[in-house]
Amino acid sequence: MNLSATLLLAFGMSMDAFAASIGKGATLHKPKFSEALRTGLIFGVIEAITPLVGWLLGLLATQFVLTWNHWIAFVLLVFLGGRMIIEGVRGCEEASEKIRRHSFWLLVTTAFATSLDAMAVGVGLAFLQVDIIKTALAIGCATLIMSTLGMMVGRFIGPLLGKRAEILGGVVLIGIGCQILWSHFAG
């Protein structure tokens, strides 16, 4: 795979994480760049690891991975999105505005859920002549950049939406999950 194809793949794989990061950034009270970078690093590392795992699974058990990856992503994203919507509704009822950070495990779970498509791509890459390490690093770096940018975009959207930002973030995650499921069934 040439450099331009690798970069297109890398940035294509980062789009779900970008959308999720916008939602995450919008739910925080003006996240600092360090928080955006932390989120970008978590998303980027996980997005770099999942195609490697997919590649290894592709060598071992292609059919199982392709049968279940969309369901796993859908369930995780709907669960996380539902949780955000519930917290957003509760937040609308509370008057206090507090500075928050997303927990490490919440970010890891979200990053994993949005990176399962990269795992499926890794399965496919097992059958091609690619340098999987360089490809995985490109995907991870693109995701780090896009997730960090997404958090900063969310920083500006969040104050406009107020406490409804968390509800919107949850809807975005559920939408990503539905899109993953739809793309599997649509073909």
From Swiss-Prot:
Pfam families associated with the record = Mntp
Kindly give the membrane topology term recorded for this protein.
Multi-pass membrane protein
Predominant cellular place of this UniProt entry's protein: membrane
Q: Name one GO cellular component term.
A: plasma membrane
Q: Which InterPro entries match?
A: Mntp/YtaF, Put_MntP
Keywords from the UniProt entry: Cell inner membrane, Cell membrane, Ion transport, Manganese, Membrane, Transmembrane, Transmembrane helix, Transport
Where's it found, cell-wise?
A: Cell inner membrane
Q: Which GO terms describe its molecular function?
A: manganese ion transmembrane transporter activity
Tell me the domain of life. Bacteria
According to the record, the segments passing through the membrane are 3-23, 41-61, 62-82, 106-128, 142-162, 167-187
- So what family is this one in? Belongs to the MntP (TC 9.B.29) family.
Q: What does this protein do?
A: Probably functions as a manganese efflux pump.
Q: What is the recorded name of this protein? A: Putative manganese efflux pump MntP
Q: Which gene encodes it?
A: mntP
